[in-house]
Amino acid sequence: MNHSTTRATILPEIIRKIMAHDHLSEDEALRAFYSSATGASFANDETGLYGQSPNYISGLYLEEQRERA
């Protein structure tokens, strides 16, 4: 499976977790995720983050948000 297919497969679960945790709409969750360092790393093939589980990636995102607060 290529990287973009892998990302497209797990992204919906990541976004659902963010939506549920932060009470956001899908668009808001997508914007928040891709505006974060975690989202940037997820989009970058060189980091390999796309190969991790949705739980791991959403956990990284939520930890990043806690640290920013």
Where are these regions (language model features)?
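C-terminal alpha-helical interaction appendages
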Residues: 1-69
